[in-house]
Amino acid sequence: MEEIGILVEKAQDEIPALSVSRPQTGLSFLGPEPEDLEDLYSRYKKLQQELEFLEVQEEYIKDEQKNLKKEFLHAQEEVKRIQSIPLVIGQFLEAVDQNTAIVGSTTGSNYYVRILSTIDRELLKPNASVALHKHSNALVDVLPPEADSSIMMLTSDQKPDVMYADIGGMDIQKQEVREAVELPLTHFELYKQIGIDPPRGVLMYGPPGCGKTMLAKAVAHHTTAAFIRVVGSEFVQKYLGEGPRMVRDVFRLAKENAPAIIFIDEIDAIATKRFDAQTGADREVQRILLELLNQMDGFDQNVNVKVIMATNRADTLDPALLRPGRLDRKIEFPLPDRRQKRLIFSTITSKMNLSEEVDLEDYVARPDKISGADINSICQESGMLAVRENRYIVLAKDFEKAYKTVIKKDEQEHEFYK
C-alpha cells in the first residue's frame, strides 16, 4: 500500500471527512442534527421573550401617551386661563434670559417678569407691545404691531376708478408723476443701469381745483402697488406722541406691503416752517414734522416705497422738507391755459348729451381765470339746469347761465376773503 502511495492512517482520516461533507452531497433532506434543534429552540424562546418584553413596552408607551395627551390638554386649558382677558398692556424692554424679561407698564413702572414658555422668543423685540397677566404681570402674549385705525391701505377693489384719460390736459404733470412714481416701481433696473437713484418723493403744488388729488387717484388706479392715503391733519392727535407714532405706523405699513405709495394730502397742515413755538400744540406739530423728516431720510432705496405730497401753500412749507433727497421732484399745477381749458372741457363733456348749438370754444376763449374744478362745476350745473326743465339735452343757454353762476360765485367768495 505504501508503494502505491496509499497510507492506512490517511485513509482512516478521510472517512470522517466524508461524514462532515455530507451536507454538500445533497443529503440535507435527512433533517438537522439534535444540536441544531436545541439551538433553534433556544433562539425561539429568546425571541419569544423579546416579543413579550416589546409588548409590555408597547402597553406602557400607550398608557404614557394617554397621560401626556391629558397633560397637554390640561396645559392648553391653563394657558387659555392665563391669557384670558382682561390683560394689562405693556411694552417689552429687554430680555434677561430665556425665561425672564424686563417690561414697562402703562403706569410708567418697569417690572422683572417671567415669560410664558409657549411664546415665540423671536417676536420679543424691543418696544414690542405685550400682554401682561393682571395679577403676576407675567408676559403671556405678544400683541401685533400697533397701527392706527385711521390708516387705511386701499385694496385692489377699493382703488379709485379714475384713469389718466379722465383727466383733461396736464400732459406734462402726468408724465412727471409717472416718471417719478410708476417707473421706479415697475422698471427699477433702468435707473440701476444708468447709475442714478430714483426720486424718493414728489410734491404736487398749485391753486385749489387744479387736479392734484385727481392725478393721485389715477396713479393709485394704474399701479399695482399698495396705496396708502392720509391727510396731513390726521397726524395731529389729542395726546402727545400720538402724531409721531402714527407717522411711524404709516411708513411701517408701507414697508411691510412694498411696493407701496404713500399719498399725504394737505401736507401744509404739519409741515409749515418751524418757529419758536410757545404752545404745546405747536411743539407737537413740529415733532410730527421731525418724525416725517426722519422717516423719509431712513428710506432704504432697496425698498420700493414712494411718497406723494400735495398742498396749496408750497411757500409755507419747511425748507428741510423741500431739499433734494426728500422731495426730489416738485410738480406745479397752475391754472389751465387756453389749450388746457379746451382739453378739460372736451374730456368732461364727452359723456354729456349736448346740443349742436353749444360752442365750447367760446367758453375756452374767455379770459376768466378758472380751474379744472370750476370747469367741472360749470358742466355739472348746466346739466342740472337741463334736468330742472325736464330736458335730456343741454342747451347753450344752460351753459351760459351755469358759467355766469360759477364765475360770479367765485368772485363773491374772493371778495369776502379780501
Curated annotation (Swiss-Prot):
The Gene Ontology biological process terms listed for this entry are: blastocyst development; proteasome-mediated ubiquitin-dependent protein catabolic process; proteolysis
Q: Name one GO molecular function term.
A: ATP hydrolysis activity
Which residues does the record list as Phosphoserine (modified residue)?
Answer: 21, 28
Instruction: Please list the residues that carry the modification N-acetylmethionine.
Output: 1
**Where is ATP annotated to bind?**
206-213
What Pfam families does its record include?
Answer: AAA, AAA_lid_3, Prot_ATP_ID_OB_C
The places in or outside the cell where this protein is found are: Cytoplasm; Nucleus
SUPFAM superfamilies reported in the protein's UniProt record: P-loop containing nucleoside triphosphate hydrolases (SSF52540)
Respond yes or no to whether keyword Magnesium is given for this record: no
The reply to whether Cell membrane figures as a keyword in the UniProt entry is: no
Question: Could you describe the subunit structure of this protein?
Answer: Component of the 19S proteasome regulatory particle complex. The 26S proteasome consists of a 20S core particle (CP) and two 19S regulatory subunits (RP). The regulatory particle is made of a lid composed of 9 subunits, a base containing 6 ATPases including PSMC4 and few additional components. Interacts with NR1I3. Interacts with PAAF1. Interacts with TRIM5. Interacts with ZFAND1.
The Swiss-Prot or TrEMBL record describes its family as follows: Belongs to the AAA ATPase family.
Q: What does this protein do?
A: Component of the 26S proteasome, a multiprotein complex involved in the ATP-dependent degradation of ubiquitinated proteins. This complex plays a key role in the maintenance of protein homeostasis by removing misfolded or damaged proteins, which could impair cellular functions, and by removing proteins whose functions are no longer required. Therefore, the proteasome participates in numerous cellular processes, including cell cycle progression, apoptosis, or DNA damage repair.
Name used for this protein in its record: 26S proteasome regulatory subunit 6B
Q: Which organism is it from?
A: Homo sapiens
